[in-house]
């Protein structure tokens, strides 16, 4: 991967793609430097995802698909049948999905792309037809993510206005980064905050620093300042005190994977926020596209939790700086935790807000109704 010094009109555009070319904003260097890395194929894409150049469940899925799209676009000579092309693509996708195991969006995207590849191979007479079908499907994912995020924002803002008492002066707390830098654009939880701000009813957004990789202080604060949204950065450990002081009306977070019962895996520290919100009678929402929901998992106990390098805690700047902890100390560094569904008031999606019937979510029924209505 090579650094790109080209200027980009929108410094918050994490994914810059045109057919045959992909550049990813190196989020490890934000907010002090804006550096784009050239991605030439699936191997570059895998390392960019694994090394946190790009992060955020939706962005990871799109970056993976487009990294392979770039490789396919620049294949000079491919000798083989349509079945050979399908085998080539499927092997690359299997490799890409190993880069980050917790985010369901990546595995969901791979499954969908494999379906496109299979259908194309069954009817195509040549390899290029299979490659073309894959390219179009990967590029569609980029466009669809932005549209889904804007819908999440609108549904979330509308729901908050109708369900929170003082809905004309909302203060919202969020965690990690769920904005343009974590998606193809606009964002999920941060997209809701953007929509609330656009409606003129946001008093203040609060963002946690989100240790140890500091996605909140480095990325979310950067986006909020960029958009001139009234915002305050807090230490992770200050969240409960902020709620106790009566300065939070709602907590909204993103999701890397949502189980069928509503249990949600998200950035480490989310569970603590949900517990504090419950204690202080503050509604806690998850904002995520339907692609983040994994109906194959009955509960959060089945979600695989990725563990990150000890260096993220032993060294400053999320492992990129100098050593700050004593040599020889043991480290436990899970990247995510699971928030039980009983702590979640609603799940904001691009098809509406999933609320509980009684004390439980019926996510499967919601998705069935939402997708069947859109197809009529």
Swiss-Prot record:
Enzymatic class: isomerase
Q: Which GO terms describe its molecular function?
A: S-methyl-5-thioribose-1-phosphate isomerase activity
Q: Where is this site: Transition state stabilizer?
A: 176
Q: Name one GO cellular component term.
A: nucleus
Among InterPro entries, the record links this protein to:
IF-2B-related, IF-M1Pi, IF_2B-like_C, Initiation_fac_2B_a/b/d, M1Pi_N, NagB/RpiA_transferase-like
Active site positions? 256 (proton donor)
**Cross-referenced Pfam families:** IF-2B
What functional role does this protein have? Catalyzes the interconversion of methylthioribose-1-phosphate (MTR-1-P) into methylthioribulose-1-phosphate (MTRu-1-P).
NCBIfam families assigned: eIF-2B_rel, PRK05720.1, salvage_mtnA
Q: Can you name this protein?
A: Methylthioribose-1-phosphate isomerase
